[in-house]
Every structure is written in C-alpha cells, then in structure tokens.
A protein has these predicted regions:
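N-terminal short secondary-structure element
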Residues: 1-35, 64
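N-terminal winged-helix
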Residues: 29-30, 80, 86-118, 122-135, ...
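A short LG(V/I)-centered, amphipathic sequence patch enriched
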Residues: 40-59
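Short beta-strand-centered segments that line the small-molecule binding cleft or hinge
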Residues: 85, 109-113, 130-174, 182, ...
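Secondary-structure junction motif
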Residues: 105, 148, 185-186, 194-218, ...
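Hydrophobic hinge/microswitch elements
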Residues: 129-132, 136-142, 148, 202-260
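Hydrophobic/proline-rich hinge and linker segments of small-molecule sensing/allosteric domains
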Residues: 160-201, 270-280, 294
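A late-sequence structural motif
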Residues: 259-298
Length: 298
C-alpha cells in the first residue's frame, strides 16, 4: 500500500474538497485525482461519492479513513523511533550486574535517572557473576556490566572498564561464635578450622576467587560445609550456625538476626565494583549510559 496515496486520501477525506486538498498537499488537482483513482483500484472499492456540488465518503471510504490514519501515524512513529535509536534516545540496553551491586544506593539512582532522561530506551537487567559477564560481553549477549573482579583478575583487553565503587570483605559469623564479640579486626587464619558457607565455584574472576585467594594467603584452603549461590542465603545459613563466611561489607545493611559482621585484618580484603563494556562498542545508547554512570557514580 502506497503511503503517499493514503496521505492524499486523508487530505481529501478531511477537506471533502479536491481543490482544497490539493492546496494543502502543495500539488495540482489532476495528480491528486489520479492518486485517488489508483487507490480505489488498489482497494477494489469506490471511496468517494463525487458530484458537482459536494464530495462525500462512501461506507468503504469511511472505513478506510480510520485505518489510514492509524497506518500513517504508525509510519511516523516508526520513523521517529528509528531516528531516536540512531541518536541513542531509543533502543534496548542489556545490563548485567553481580548480586551485591543493587545494594549500592548509587545503582538504583543512576538507573532511575537514565530511565527518566531516556524513556524510550528499554532496560533489560540480568543477574550474572563476573565471569559470566565477561563471557556474555564477548559473545555480544549483553551491552554493559557491573562486576566485582578479584584483585588478581585481569579483565581481557577487548573489554573496557571503569572502577565505580570500593568496599571491603568482612567476616560473617554466627552471633554465638566465640569471635563474634571481638573488638578488633580478625585475621582470617584464626578461622582456618571453621566450616565455611561460600558461593559454589562458577565462571571465575569474581568474589569466590577473591575469597579463595584470601584463604590461600592466610595459609589454608577453606572447608566448604555448605555452598550457596546467593549471598543472602549464605548469611541466613551463617545465622543458623552452619558455618562462617566472607562477604562484601555492603551486605551488612541486610544482615539477618543471628549473624554479625566483623572486619578482616588481612591486607587483601579490599574489593571494588567495575563498569565494563566492549572496547569497540559504538551503540549511542551504550555510550550515553557509560557517560552518565561515570558522571554520577559518587
């Protein structure tokens, strides 16, 4: 269906006068009449009743008028969305984040501000570990990631990174633990014989590897009595007395009753959250998101 013919049809249908419709469209009347005849042939129905005194819509013309308005409006909307997408104002942004990232107040604030500024950009949020994010970025399955790389992890060169926030790892102990009331930072080696509640080994590079490296520096391999994929679950199991754990300090705000946090004395306890994307990323909405996040990260 020719969009120009529909535009001509709508002008005549609204003016009910071929001369005024032609003026409105900045064209002469004969080409306009020809466009209407071609549209009637295409539709297989007469669209206008014509007389010397008046022009009126036939039942078929009245039905087409409503549909034609929708088609023309959709075409205009599609064009506008395409232009917005080309400039980064519309599209889909796939964002991955590790479990602790939503606990940082800045995360929800920056998402809200981006959504308010660019309402036509759809945010597709996914929970992934650090290693899963690297794999997904490389495969083109996500656009941006918020990850927690271990100090020893080297982010691959095709990946661009920017440190956003820093915190440190802390001990999570049952409230009844003998060290729970300690007033000074605890050395991890003091808990070498304790059962641990930790994340299972998944794609590497993140929190699990950092904790194992801490334990190795302290001279032991942790005995994992209970694996738990979610840190909130780990804390609940610690509160139940199933073991001790090492978790980011940001989780202290959701520490359940029965568990306590104690600072670590180990020097390698420091951790960070990094923003990552592909080095060659050219999508405007990704670049705009990156710039906004880095501008409001504090």
């Amino acid at each position: 269906m020719d969009l120009r013919r529909l535009t001509c049809f709508l002008a005549v249908a609204e003016e009910l006068n071929f001369s005024r419709a032609a003026q409105r469209l900045h064209m002469s009347q004969p080409p306009l009449s020809q466009q209407i005849r071609l549209l009637e042939q295409e539709m297989g129905a007469q669209l206008f009743e014509r007389s010397r005194r008046a022009v009126s819509l036939t039942p078929a013309g009245a039905l087409l008028q409503d549909k034609a308005r929708q088609i023309v409006a959709l075409h205009q909307q599609a064009g506008e969305l395409c232009r917005m997408a080309a400039s980064g104002l519309a599209g889909r942004l796939r964002i991955a984040f590790t479990a602790s990232v939503p606990l940082f107040a800045q995360f929800s604030r920056m998402l809200g501000e981006f959504r308010q500024r660019y309402p036509q950009v759809e945010l597709d949020l996914q929970h992934m570990t650090t290693g899963e994010q690297i794999a997904a970025l490389t495969a083109g399955q996500i656009d941006v990631g918020f990850m927690r790389p271990s100090p020893a992890f080297r982010i691959p060169l095709p990946i661009r990174e920017q440190t956003l926030w820093r915190d440190e790892l802390m001990l999570a102990l049952p409230a009844a633990h003998e060290q729970a009331a300690a007033g000074t930072p605890l050395a991890l080696r003091a808990l070498a014989e304790q059962p641990f509640v930790l994340h299972p080994a998944v794609l590497g590079g993140g929190l699990h590897e950092h904790i194992l490296a801490l334990c190795s520096e302290a001279g032991f391999v942790p005995r994992i009595a209970q694996p738990a994929r979610e840190t909130a679950t780990m804390l609940a199991l610690v509160a139940a007395g199933l073991g001790v754990s090492v978790v980011p300090s940001v989780y202290e705000r959701i520490c359940p009753p029965g568990a306590v946090f104690r600072p670590l004395a180990d020097a390698a306890r420091h951790s960070r959250i990094a923003l990552v994307c592909r080095q060659d990323e050219s999508a405007p909405c990704v670049q705009m998101f990156w710039q906004q996040v880095c501008a409001v990260r504090d």
